Structure formats: structure tokens, C-alpha cells
Amino acid sequence: MSAKPLWYRWARVYFAGSCIIGTGVLCFIYTTPTDEQLIASFSPEIREDYEKNKAYRQREQQELMEIVKKTSQSDEPVWKTGPIGSPLEKEQRNLNQQLIDYNQFEKKRAEEYQREQIDKAQEELLEVEKLAAQAKKGYWWNPFSSK
């Protein structure tokens, strides 16, 4: 029989378990790439597609979070997914699972970009008009002013 006390055996068990868990955590930390490293390892076509659709995915995630908040505030069971069609129910399997219409999203984004460009052009026009007005404004004592 073993003459070692019970606490010693349990201490060994906890130490061994801690070593196993610590090894797993360290392996996870040092082998998992960061988001930047992962994106950098993509091929140029996939990276371009990722960057192009980044805003769309963020908007879709925001829409999903709004649906989750609405669903959590209701008294219905968790498995009722609200406006999202459940793939587990027969009558909802063929429903569109997209939360946001991609074409509408791109159209709205293009309109916002166009509006920004128009605002920027108007600001530049005002600045040019202000500079032109200052150039026209000449003083009689200034021999270098153009009249």
C-alpha cells in the first residue's frame, strides 16, 4: 500500500491537470494566427473579395444582433427564430436566409459615396469662389493687386 497521504495524491492530480490545460492554452496561443496574419495569407483574389464584402458582413451582423435583441425581449421560446427562417422546419426550409439584400446594400453604399463626393466638390467650389473673391478685391495702395 501507499504510505503517501490523500492530499498528496490529489495535489498530483491537480498539478498534472494544470500542466495539460496549460500546455493546451500555450499551444493555442502560439499556433493560432491573428486576423491580420490570416488575411495576409489569403490569395489576392480572396483578400480582395474579403475587403469588398467587409462592410456588408458588418451590416448583416448588426441586423442579426437587432433580431436577437427583439427575440430575447419577446415571450416566445428560444427556438422560434423570429423573421429568420429555421432550416429545421419544413415550411421554412426554402426561405431566403439573407438578412440584407446585397444589391440594395451596394446601391445605398454607392449613393452615400456619391453624396460624399458631391459634398466634397461643393466645399471645394466654395473655397475656390472665396479665393477668387479675395483675388478680385484689390486695394488702391497695393501696386501688386490686379484690377
Swiss-Prot record:
Residues 88-139 form a coiled coil. One of its GO terms (cellular component) is mitochondrial inner membrane. The keyword Manganese does not apply. It comes from the Eukaryota. InterPro entries: Cbp4. The chain crosses the membrane at residues 13-32. Keywords: Chaperone, Coiled coil, Membrane, Mitochondrion, Mitochondrion inner membrane, Transmembrane, Transmembrane helix. It is found in: Mitochondrion inner membrane. It is a single-pass membrane protein. The keyword Mitochondrion applies. GO terms for biological process: mitochondrial respiratory chain complex III assembly. Essential for the assembly of ubiquinol-cytochrome c reductase. It has a direct effect on the correct occurrence of the Rieske protein, core 4, core 5 and apocytochrome b. Belongs to the CBP4 family. This is Assembly factor CBP4. The gene is CBP4.
